Amino acid sequence: MNLIEKIEQEEVARLSANKVLPSFAPGDTVVVSVNVVEGTRKRTQAFEGVVIAKRNRGLNSSFIVRKISSGEGVERTFQTYSPLIASVEVKRRGDVRRAKLYYLRDRSGKSARIKEKLQARVKPTAAVAAE
């Protein structure tokens, strides 16, 4: 491991120590709370949409969230370890077969929907079934 990789690893550890990001994947619907500074006021702004891409590059990791606002598609790229991100909340898990969902840009309406990932049912064990 060279010096740059070591420094990046330490920086990632320092930035993620005070903030816990949930694990999410492309297809998931997330709410990203962003700290916005307007003049002297500081407030939190929520951006809810579908994760269409995720880029894992250590300190340079990022993800793209897409939403439809007043009939217009809006995409926003967030740096994963940015201090401007207050929190990330996963609303629903999407069941997709691709890592990059750029094809959603060309679709609208029902064809742009993403199926929800269902949790696997746990089979009861023989001991529990015997009772």
UniProtKB/Swiss-Prot annotation:
Q: Which Gene3D superfamilies match?
A: 2.30.30.790
What are the protein's UniProt keywords? Ribonucleoprotein, Ribosomal protein
Q: Please state what the protein is called.
A: Large ribosomal subunit protein bL19
Question: What PANTHER family does its record include?
Answer: LARGE RIBOSOMAL SUBUNIT PROTEIN BL19M (PTHR15680:SF9), RIBOSOMAL PROTEIN L19 (PTHR15680)
Question: What is the role of the protein in this entry?
Answer: This protein is located at the 30S-50S ribosomal subunit interface and may play a role in the structure and function of the aminoacyl-tRNA binding site.
Its BP terms in the Gene Ontology are:
translation
* Superkingdom of the source species: Bacteria
Family to which the UniProt record says this protein belongs: Belongs to the bacterial ribosomal protein bL19 family.
Q: By its UniProt entry, which Pfam families does this protein fall under? A: Ribosomal_L19
Disulfide bond entries: none
